[in-house]
Amino acid sequence: MPNVDEETLVEQGAIPPTDFHDKIERIREISDYEIEAPEDLTARLDQAISGLLLPPETLKAAAAALRVGHIVLQGPPGTGKSSLARALCEAFNASIFPVTAHEDWTVFDVIGRLELRLHSDRKEEIVPVNGYFTEAVIRCANATVRHFDEPMEPQAEWLLIDELNRAHMDRAFGELFTVLGTDSAIPITLPHQRDGNRNLVVPRRFRIVATLNSFDRQFVNNLSQAIRRRFTFISVNIPDKRPAGSMWTNADAAAPLAIREFHIVVNRVASRVANRLTSLDPTKTDEKSVELRTKLSGALSDSVQKLFDLVEQLRYAASGGRVPHLPIGTAQIIDTVELFLFRVLQDGVADANVAEVMDWAVSVKLVPLFDSDVVAPEVLKEFAEHLSAPFNGATRRELLGIVAAGMHFVE
């Protein structure tokens, strides 16, 4: 029997190609393969979210939803939606094709378009350019074939869309409504591609993992019922309120998420600042991180705890009360404490004066978040006027400035 090379087998249709960009219609050949759930999926999920503040139920719900179809992770800013999305992809052994939604998206950005290209020899050529969805599907098919030969390779590539509701989804996704809502191998027509390379079948192994900021939804585009029906929505919220009488400094591993958040913030800030300070000599990073962690847990701990007390008031404020509701995410707290620590170190602030630095950090990091908070001006004004130390200085002034400037949003 004569030797037949792999390229010949691909051309004869005996085996699928390893790159479908010029053979889009052959994706149908591998489209029926379902997602493989790793035997150690639970362990992989736990490993992937080790640094995230998530209740087990949220993780289990997201994993189950991904097994079935496309998902949207919704919640306030800074709660770890994007990190969870990446962690889920990692746990399922899928690489990601990340994009951020934009209000100007059209079907040309999502499906594809023709572009005029100027080559180095000054010749012009019209070339097809795949949109985000099309490119992600092709890459997913490529990954699936590679995974057949190399099981350690990703089994798929998934489209990760941040801030999904910033785009006009009905306008941008067009005929994708049909294929996202069925398990049937219905092809999408790609008008920007050449004849014979236009019919795209979405593999069963492909997923869209999207994030959605549920807090400022009044400032972005609402998702239609048609879009919502094609995704499972998983809420990623701030931690539940700490039990009454619990101390922020409780180091028990079984402590509630709100308490564990305090220690995660301290550790994350110490690590980030240490990396910045020792970038020219990484051998000193670990030592510096321990030093900063000790400082945050010691001399600076009172200021950090007062920040958490303030955040707790805002996060769990009751509707109609004298405290405005603002679901501040962990990421914003980390940013605030990092800025606080840097200022203390930079200015050589004495321990007796660090509270003023925390007040300043809150005024420039957290107060601007109220510019998009839906709160009656009288509530914001009363809250500012009744702030206690250390937030009765710069933080109060900035909040009252927002009230005076009319930059709040009234219900």
Residue ranges and their predicted role:
Residues 1-411:
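C-terminal regulatory/interaction module of P-loop NTP-utilizing enzymes
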